[in-house]
Every structure is written in structure tokens, then in C-alpha cells.
């Protein structure tokens, strides 16, 4: 831990940039063979020619594919990426079987889930999530700031330094921002066209709390703030792979950089070779033959000139076999990269007829085996943090019952839970044991699997009881009327059959 009280943010930043250099070089090398704009060379600007270093778009497409799939998994558009799960034991102890109270809690959870999901969409957090994932795939480390009710701000590697503990978690981080307009509450000592604002966040060794302090040109600005723990900070550091002894996290693409580099070199070789091989050049034997180059050049299409066919030949590179070798190698590496970056194009087997169902099944198997590990790296750290931040902004609290925010595979495992319940219900039906099942509980569970808001959709227990009572009363009344009509009919029949009954004898 650092002595935050005696540490100047700008001095801390400048003294730790040297540890960052190897990770900058690694990120730039990966970007140069994939998406150069993600990590541009130091000193480049909007006028710099970015794609001079790259010879193909394949690597960039794989990175964008993985980014899209991870983004859709972390923030799926059709359902919530999290679950609000109440403490089951507390529910039993508190409500003691009161189904009306339990339904009220579930409706409250459903409404809050919708409110959180809507707020995430309104703040356009999804687009910032894609930018953050891109940084982690190509660069490895990134810092995110959650702006209150205003989405997120992404800070790439060249804008911050960090100190990590023995588990790869941050102990201190400092961010530099180049601003023309300073945030509210920060007054500089001197007026400038552009300011460099340094923000230091560090764990205080004495209080075990996080402190945030800022400076411009070494002069303290703003108000020093204290946060109870790391989760309370508006800033959060995210990294991909970390190895003991590393100063920063390593990117996902580093594992596959040799293959990406080979694809780029082979693509350049095959492209340049194809251009040369496709070049149309005619060779004319003027000295020993009867054909003149000028006659051939000036001849119109379909013209007749003096000459001999053997005097004219077309240039041929005759490197077809060599290009087949390089093309084959490029194809093999591309298929391996497609599998590693979750591109479903890699699952299609080399055959004349491949059904869509076959591709779908193989793609599901690929993503089930690979995406689970990739996705789990981000779900708990990012999803739970962002959901908690949005809940704080919306002042959503649960006082009666403790509620856990489930993210990651626990949240996305709802389809498997629904399938298990389907199988269970089929088995119960086959055994003719449906009378043991609480229908309302079944409906609530199915709705929770898909994140459906049940408020106003599913009847409450009280409504069902009222309807059942009304139906029973209607049935009883109908039965009474029918029995009365039947009795009256029987009496009338007796009177017709025996008209003298009751008369004088």
C-alpha cells in the first residue's frame, strides 16, 4: 500500500509509467495485425494512416465477433443479464407460508428487475461495454468510470497506471485526463486551453478505506473523498489474464498472436502473389521470328497481321503449387483462430451438403465449451458491479428480505432450469400426481426463468380464491335451480298421471 496522504497523483503517475511500457508494446503489436485503431502508435492522431501495417481483415473480424458474442452474453437484448434472488430461508421464516406476501415480494423483484434493465438501456451502457471488451481482448487492461445516471467512461491503457496486489487486484490506480473543460467543483490555479487532470485512487493502509484525490500541475484540486471499500468506488479496473509477477493484465489475443501474425504474413504473400500471377504480359520474339511487337500492339480486335503464332507467348509465373501450400496453411490457421474466437464458421465441415441443423448443433457445442470460460471472466466482476451501481442510482433497496444479485452462468442458466422443470412436470403428469402441484408456483417459476414481469399478468392467490368461490356459488345456485325445476316437473307429472288424486271420494 502507498502512503496516500503524502502522495501527489501526478508524481505517482509519472513514476509508474515505465512498468506499463512492455504491455503497450504487446498491445500495439496485436493491434497492428488486427484493428490498428484500438491501440495506435504513440503520437499518432486522426490523420495517421492506420491500416498500412495490416494486410487482411480476418483478424479484426474475429476480435469483433468475440466482442459481440461476449457483449450479447453480458447484456442480452431480449432478457435481463441478472437475477434478483431472495433468501429462501428468510422467506420461509418471515412469511410462514403466506402466499399473498410471497407473491408481493416476487412482484416487487420483477418490477425492480425491469427498472434496472430499462435504466441500463437508457444510459447506453451496452455501447460502452463493447468498447471495454475490445480493450480487454486486444490490450488486456482498462479502467471504467460509472457516471451517475450518465453511462460509463472508458480509460485505455495509456491513460492510467495501476499497482496490483499478489492476487492481481488493484491497490492503487491513477488516471490522467486531458480536458478543455474541467468537471464541476474543480478550480485550477491557472487558466489554460487544456488541462491534465490526475485522479489517484488508493487503499489507505491505516484506515483500510479507499481515498480519491486529484491534482493539476501538482496542485491539489477538488475535494478529497473517502470510500468504504473497492466496490463503492465510481472507478473500476478490469483485466483479462494475469500471471504472478505481472504489473498489468495480458489480453485475450496474446495467446493467439503467433497465429494472427502468420495469417497476416500469409495473406500478404498470397495477395501479392495473386496480383503478380494475374498480370497479363505478352512476350514477342522479334529477333528470330516474323512477328513485330508494334504490329501486335497496334492491331485492332479481330485484325489480320503478318506473323507467326509461335513468336508470341503469354507470361506465366508457374508458382501454382507454391501458392497452394501457402493457401492451405492460411486456411488451417484461420479455422483454428475461428474456433478460438467463437466464430461459428469454423464448425462447418468440408462437404458438399451440410444441413443448417448440423451447423446449429455444432455451433452450440462450440460456444458451450468455450464461451462459458470466456464469459465467466467478466460476468461476476462487471455485471454485478454495474447492476449494483444502477440499483444505488435508482435507490432500490430490499429491507424485509436479503436479496442476492446473481450474474454470470447462474443468471444465464435459466434455460437449463426451465428444461429441468419441463421434465419434472412431464413426469408428474405421467404419474397422475398433478394434484400435488401448486399451479401458481409453477407459473411464477416459469416466468422468472425468462425474466417476465408478472405484475398484472398472473392472478394473485386472492383473485383465484375469489373466482373459485364465485364459481362454487354459481354451481351451487345452478344445481339448486336444476333440482327445483326437476322437483316441480316431477310434481306436475304426478298431477297429470293422477288427475283425481286429492278429489272427493
Task: Give residue spans per PLM region.
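Exposed alpha-helical structural elements
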Residues: 104-107, 111-115, 124, 128-129, ...
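A broad, structural surface signal
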Residues: 2, 110, 114-122, 131-138, ...
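Generic amphipathic alpha-helical segments used as scaffolds and interaction surfaces in large
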Residues: 96-107, 116-132, 247-257, 317-324, ...
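Short, hydrophobic/amphipathic alpha-helical patches that form generic packing surfaces
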Residues: 69-76, 257-272, 444-448
